[in-house]
Design a protein with these regions (language model features):
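Internal intein/HINT superfamily modules and their associated LAGLIDADG
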Residues: 1-204
Length: 204
C-alpha cells in the first residue's frame, strides 16, 4: 500500500485478528520502493487513471491552419482520505504519493477544484502531456500491463502516438479519428484476451 487507504487495510487486519487468534496478521507500513519496481502504479491507474486523445483544428483569425492531435495520460484523486490516518500510516493527504507520481513522470502536480450545486471537490492531478513523460508512461505500462479496459485504451493511445510521429497526412488523421470515435466511453467492443496471459500461482 502506498496511499492513505492503508488505514482501511489495517482496520480490516485488526478486525480479523480480534476474531481469530490462530495467527496474528502483521500490519506492514507503506511501500516506499521505487514506483517502477512493481505493478502498484498499474493497479492505481486501473482505478484512477485515464488516457485521452484530442483532435482539434488550429485557426488564426478565423482561417484554418491545420488539424492537431494531442494525447494525455492523467491521474486525478481527491486530496484527502475520508478517515483519520495516523502519521505512522502516512497521514490522510494524497499529496505525497501524487507528488511522487508526478515526479516519476517528470511533470508538475496540479490542484483542481470542482463545484456542484451543494458540494466542492478538491483533487490532485498529474498529467503526462509531452514526449518525455509519454516515453516514461509507455515504458512503465509495457513492463507492468493494465488489467481493466484501460489496457485497451492504452494500446489505442499508443497507436495514435505512433501515427502522429512525423508528418500528419490525411490517411493517418483518418485512422486517428476512427480510433478516437470508439475510445473510452464510446467503445462498444471490448477484447479482454490480454487477461489470458495472467498467471496465478497458489502458494501453500
Amino acid at each position: 500500500m502506498r496511499t492513505p487507504k492503508i488505514e482501511a487495510l489495517h482496520r480490516a487486519i485488526h478486525w480479523i485478528n480480534e476474531r481469530d487468534s490462530t495467527y496474528s496478521i502483521p500490519c506492514l507500513g507503506l511501500d516506499l520502493s521505487p514506483l517502477d519496481s512493481n505493478s502498484w502504479l498499474a493497479g492505481f491507474t486501473d482505478a484512477d487513471g485515464c488516457f485521452s486523445i484530442t483532435v482539434y483544428d488550429r485557426k488564426k483569425n478565423g482561417v484554418f491552419l491545420r488539424t492537431s492531435v494531442q494525447t494525455f495520460f492523467r491521474i486525478e484523486v481527491k486530496q484527502n482520505y475520508s478517515r483519520e490516518v495516523t502519521p505512522n500510516q502516512g497521514g490522510s493527504s494524497y499529496f505525497t504519493i501524487l507528488s511522487e507520481i508526478a515526479a516519476f513522470f517528470t511533470v508538475n502536480l496540479y490542484t483542481r477544484v470542482r463545484k456542484t450545486e451543494d458540494k466542492v471537490f478538491y483533487a490532485f492531478v498529474a498529467v503526462a502531456h509531452n514526449s518525455r513523460s509519454h516515453e516514461i508512461v509507455r515504458k512503465y505500462f509495457d513492463s507492468y500491463p493494465l488489467y481493466s479496459s484501460k489496457y485497451i485504451a492504452y494500446k489505442d493511445w499508443c497507436v495514435v502516438q505512433d501515427l502522429h510521429r512525423g508528418s500528419l497526412n490525411k490517411d493517418k488523421l483518418d485512422k486517428i479519428k476512427t480510433i478516437k470515435n470508439s475510445f473510452n466511453s464510446k467503445r462498444k467492443v471490448f477484447d479482454f484476451s490480454h487477461l489470458d496471459s495472467l498467471n496465478f500461482e497458489r502458494k501453500l
